Every structure is written in structure tokens, then in C-alpha cells.
């Protein structure tokens, strides 16, 4: 054995100094992740210039995902510190004013006015210093955002990002998806991408109701419903584009056929699993098809027999777009939809609803669990999303295709061509 006799030759290069390589000479090990980019050195006293991908992760996509969530948290905490400082300054001013008014000597004459003026000056000074710190932090985050945004891959990028003009159908499953942008009133031009992990863990509800926000109330009902359906179509197109060919299918329920215009990018490209379903019969057929799929996959998973699924069962991810819910839905269809919302995501069936909750008020509280199970977003700006760190109300805006751009149609044409080639 080692240490007995001189029959074993030393490894080339080893001369008894330095660390010993204990790796097996013929056993391959997984390569460590490439190190994240390092920021160039900064001048003394200055923050280091930001670098895209400056976070932990095994891939560039994961590092960018973690970096964006880090920016999200940094912005939330910076604004929380500023708001806390302003609240403290105003609270202290109120206390000083109360003390000044409670002293009879200060109620009359110039002494009281001087005490009140000093209290207000101190409040303004504290507020100004807090704002100076906030502006410094926001400037650093804006500089980081300016570096990160151009480096984002297609699943994370806005529709105005040049990455979409060089789009190619991916070969690997995506990690996350951009649902829209978030901002706070302290600096509305600093937008944080809202990224969600894939596959989706819960369905999405695009609220087409006019009572949701001031922006919604100021938008006409027909216009708001069209914007909501446009948002659903661009989200479905993004999902189709970021998955490999034929790994993601989109189904549509449009009971009255009211969304034909908004659905044109999907129908014209031929990327839907079937034509949009309309009428009670169409609604029933689509729900029965997807319910059967969820049932079969659940049974196969529980039995540990995934290989026993019927050969006609598509094992990819599925998205069901439902327009104008609950129109066209009877009690049985509503029950099936709730089942898909609850049990579908775990087995690859996801729900994207375009609905006004007021339209479903006749169903009463029976639909409350359905609404709660869905991630609510809006077709216009609305401050209804809350962060998990300090509880700010963030204004959400969906990803929109730039006016006059054909990028959506171009991307869907490439998706359709890849699906046809993969089916041969």
C-alpha cells in the first residue's frame, strides 16, 4: 500500500510540497459554476460600478434572477428607511409643537412662533437628510438597472429589449418569466422586473374590473376588457416563446367570441392547441379535456407509474386562457375550473383568467377560494402588490409591446415554424 516500498510512482509534478490532489484520475466530477462577474475596482470612497450577473447562481440566468430579486429587496428596504425617517421627523415635530403649546409662556407672543418655527426647521432638516440618503441609494440602483436590463435573456426581458429581435426558439426549459414591472412613488422611473419561477405555481387573474383602481375607473369598460385580453395574449406568447418547441400548449375559452380581435396574434400564427372554444359545448369540451389530463397525471404520479400514461396524453405544460368568466359557465363548469386552479399547477395545467369579479357576484362566496388562489394582476397601473420584506404597496404595470412594433408577430412566427418542424 502507500508508504510501503517504492513500487508506486509519484504523480507527475508532485515533489512533496503543496496540496495533494485526491481526485480519482479517471472519475469525472461536475464542473463548478463559473464565478459571477466581478465589478471593476472603484475610486476610494466611491461605490463599485455595477455588473450584470453580480449574484450567486449556477448559470447566468440564475445569477440575473437572484440579482433582480436583490435589487427588489434593496429598493424596498431603502424606501422603508426613508419613510421611517420621515415619520420620525414628523412625529418629533408634533411632540415639540405640543410641548410648546402646553407651556403658557409660549401661547402668546413671539416665543411660541419661534418654538414652532424651530420644530418645523428640524423636521425639514431630518427629512432632507433622509431624502439625500434615499436619492444616493436610488441612483445606485438605477445605475445597476441600466446595466442589468440590456443583459437580460428573453424570458426576463421587456418587449422593447433587442434580445427579442435576435430570438431563437430555446432548447432548454426556462427558469423564470417576467410578468411586468414594479415601482414605488419615490421614483417612478426606477422599474424592477416582476419575475416568477417556472413552471407557474399558481394561476394568474387579469382583473378587467373598473373598480380595481383609479386608472381602471378612468378607462372605459370596453377598452379595459380589450387591454386585459391583450395582456393575456402577450403573456401567453411569452410563455410559448420561452419554452422549447411543443413543450407548452395554449388553450382558449372565449364563450361569446368577444376576444377574436385580441387573440389574432395567436390564431394567425397557428400556435394554439385548438381554435378558441365558444358556447356552452366548447367550454365543456375544453374543461373535460384538461380535467382528464389532471386526473390521469395525478393518478400516475401517486402510483409511481408515469410510464403508464396513455400515448395520446401530452406531457408538456398547458395554459388555459379563460375570457369573460363566468359567462358560459354552468355550475359543473365552475367546479371543474376550481379543480384546475387548485390541482392543475402541480401537474402542468395552468390557468390564466380574464375576469371582472363583479360579474361573478351571483355565485356568492363559493368563488372566494378561486380568486384567492390566483395571482391578481391588472391591465393598467395599480398599486395592489405587496413585497414580502416590509409590506410596501407596489405599482404593477404589465409588459407591453411597443406601439407599432411587429416583434410579437415575428416571435410567434418563429415559434410556429419550430413547432411544425418538431412535429415531423
What positions do the PLM features span?
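Accessory regions of macromolecular translocation/handling assemblies
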Residues: 1-424
